[in-house]
């Protein structure tokens, strides 16, 4: 990774993060959805974004597949590329949090070290790890993209849960049962955001 040039300096903005948050009426924060492919991350994150939007909360959803069409289109699925994928997404999420948004990210992000890296980059109280815990057998039965079938057939290498490890969170801010109804999971997340004074009741 390239080092910073000594002539590149950080410029403070005239409008502060606090002012942006006052404008939005809520705090800026990242909800980092993690779990196996097919666990329901994107589905739950999308449903939560809809619920927040209806409440007037300024949001943005960053989806694992979508960013690989542009921001991360040059990356593959090696451990090194996955780390860089998460680093880039973390930096984008950080900028959005500075803008006062509630950012929802739906990424397998299989390694604890990468998730911790983003947590530290965001800072205290700005990173909420959401573990969508769905058994591998259920994820494989759902297989919405047909990826498990390809992985089992040897057509897809380095697939998380099959021939690449997934490190489950040890201390996620919220642990969701991915077999529950999406509406129930959204209510749990809304309760957490309200109790944490991120959004208003």
Curated annotation (Swiss-Prot):
Pathway: Sulfur metabolism; hydrogen sulfide biosynthesis; sulfite from sulfate: step 2/3
Key words of the record: ATP-binding, Kinase, Nucleotide-binding, Phosphoprotein, Transferase
Taxonomy, superkingdom: Bacteria
Keyword Phosphoprotein: yes
Residues of the active site: 109 (phosphoserine intermediate)
Protein family membership: Belongs to the APS kinase family.
NCBIfam families hit by this protein: apsK, PRK03846.1
Protein name stated in the entry: Adenylyl-sulfate kinase
The species this protein was found in: Klebsiella pneumoniae subsp. pneumoniae (strain ATCC 700721 / MGH 78578)
């Amino acid at each position: 990774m390239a080092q910073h040039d000594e002539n590149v300096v950080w410029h403070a903005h005239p409008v502060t993060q606090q002012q942006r948050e006052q404008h939005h009426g809520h705090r800026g924060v990242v909800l980092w959805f993690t779990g196996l492919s097919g666990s329901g991350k994107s589905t739950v994150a999308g449903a939560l974004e809809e619920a927040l939007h209806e409440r007037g909360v300024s949001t943005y959803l960053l989806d694992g597949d979508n960013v690989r069409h542009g921001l991360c289109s040059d990356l593959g699925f090696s451990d090194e590329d996955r780390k860089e994928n998460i680093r880039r997404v973390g930096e984008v999420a950080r900028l959005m949090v500075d803008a006062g948004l509630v950012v929802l990210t739906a990424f397998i992000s299989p390694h604890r070290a990468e998730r911790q890296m983003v947590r530290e980059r965001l800072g205290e109280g700005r990173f909420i790890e959401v573990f969508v815990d769905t058994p591998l057998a259920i994820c494989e039965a759902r297989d919405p993209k047909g990826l498990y079938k390809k992985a089992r057939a040897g057509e897809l290498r380095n697939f998380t849960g099959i021939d690449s490890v997934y490190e489950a969170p040890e201390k996620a801010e919220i642990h969701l049962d991915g077999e529950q109804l999406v509406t129930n999971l959204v209510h749990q997340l809304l309760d957490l955001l309200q109790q944490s004074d991120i959004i208003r009741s």
